[in-house]
C-alpha cells in the first residue's frame, strides 16, 4: 500500500488530539474525568448562541452561504477592517492548510519555533515534505526566540509562523519585539501571527494583534478562532485577516460551503455575547491562578501562562 502513497504523507507523525471523555471513561473504567487536554472552554455557551443554533436547525437541508458573507462582514466591523480583509475557515486549522498550500512553492520553506503548534509541521510535511519545515530553538524560558528565528531566515524561507501566546508552553512575546521582528522580515516573506489565545492576555496594551500591520498593507496574516474563549470548539470556526491581495488568493483555494450554517450563525451570535467572553476570561484567570499555586505547592516547575492552560513538568516520566 505504501507504494501508492505520496511519500510526503509517509513522513508525517500524525496529530494526536485529546480523546473524548467517553473514550477515556471506557478505556480506563473511570466514572468522573476532568478533561484538560484540549484547552477547551468549560463554560456552557450563552443562551443567545443556543437560540441561534436552534433557529438554524430548520435550515440544515440547505447549503450554507459559501462566501460566509455576513460573518465576514461582522468580523471586519469587530476588528476595524474591511470585508475583503477577512476569510473564514472550518477552524483556523483549515486556514493554516490553505496558507501553506497556496504560498509555498517548490524548494521554499516554512519557519517557526520548536515546541509550538504541531499542525504547522504536519501540514508543511504533507504538502512539501519534512525538509521544507525549519525549527528555531526556543529561549530558556520557553518563549519564541525571535532572534533565533530571524537568524534562520534565508532566500528559501516563505512563511513564518509566530504563535502568540504559544501552544503548548503558554508563554507570550511582548509587543515591541514582535514589531521589531516584523520590520526585519524581508518583504517577500509572509508572517503569520497565530493569535488563538489572544483574549487571555493579561495586558492587551503590550500585545500585537497584527491589525495595524494589516492596515499598513504588510505581508502579515492574523489567525483567530472561536474554539477557545467563545466556546465553539465543536463547531469548527476560525478566520484569517490580511491585506486584500492575500485574502483574494486564499479564496481561490477555499473549499465551497466550508463552514456550516449552524457554525456561521453561532459565531455571529457569539460576537454579540461580550458578557460571556468576559466571564470566560475572568473564570479562566481565577482558576488558572489556583491551579498554578497548587501545582507549585507539589514542588513542580510550572510555566507562567497567558492562555487557558498550564505547562508543568512532572517528577516522573509520563510514559510510565
Where are these regions (language model features)?
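Short acidic capping loops at alpha-helix termini that bridge into adjacent secondary structure
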Residues: 32, 82-86, 106-109, 156, ...
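N-terminal small-domain helix-loop-helix segment of the aminotransferase-like
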Residues: 2-93, 98
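Short hydrophobic alpha-helical segments of the AMP-binding
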Residues: 75, 124, 185
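Active-site pre-lysine segment of PLP-dependent enzymes
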Residues: 143-155, 168-191, 195-227
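PLP-dependent aminotransferase class I/II
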Residues: 219-296, 300-303
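Conserved PLP-binding catalytic core of the aspartate aminotransferase-like
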Residues: 138, 294-320
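Short beta-strands and strand-loop turn motifs
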Residues: 35-37, 131-135, 159-165, 191-195, ...
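PLP-dependent aminotransferase-like
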Residues: 102-158, 162
